[in-house]
């Protein structure tokens, strides 16, 4: 409870997985009936909630859809990965023993802290037994959970997300999802939704099979995506008299460019409406293959130069509040 100065009478509703420093989500929202949802990322886990089937390997895919032959691996692959993991456990990393985000192995100095070495090797053992063999059910990873009151997953197959929002008119739940090398997404969360990770990122014509125990969770293409990731973060609906021109439009923020985007919804509020011909496919595509530039975003761009935006929200006063981690500032946009 908020007493006007600080929070009191705190109550633990749910412990969320956060074994790693990245890809653990954390955004929360309450719907029009007061049900509270939270989103988690993959937390560097690979299992049924990341759409791995019994015949699959636990390999992280970067984009698109892979063939069965590309997915399958044998015991030699498993042992090779495990030995590689143990080898780098004796090197110093700022991330983790698998080396994500680190320089080449030979360029890293030896780890001098024995406790770090033990922790690194324990992670390798965990990967060996759980990731490679048990097809572990990494509970509450890559999902949208119903927190209060407790309920089943609203969605599975989410790589990572910094944004949840509820349409004030329809009550529909929306999220943002961060791609790897390709495709940041905006998704409408249908009941028992499968967002596709780690088999699919971005729109596709290829169907995927939901994992055992989650057959009722169905995949649908994103409502909008960026082929070149923008570091998509928060989203909120403009339920404010100050923004009459954009009343009930969806606003979305990013961290790579410091941009805020605006999206007009159709009559059913299940899709977006665009005037630009090149946005009719619901994708901001690359200008050309292997380019580092996206198509023009002029139609959907609302504001820019906000730094690394971690959150946006329309407040009770009708203003749009923008949290910029890079600037260390909360901006207020009003008319």
What do these predicted ranges mean?
Residues 12, 28, 36, 260, ...:
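Hydrophobic beta-strand residues in large extracellular and virion-surface proteins
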Residues 5, 147-149, 332-335:
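Flexible "stalk/tail and boundary" regions
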Residues 156, 304, 314:
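Conserved strand-loop elements at the edges of beta-sheets that form or border functional pockets
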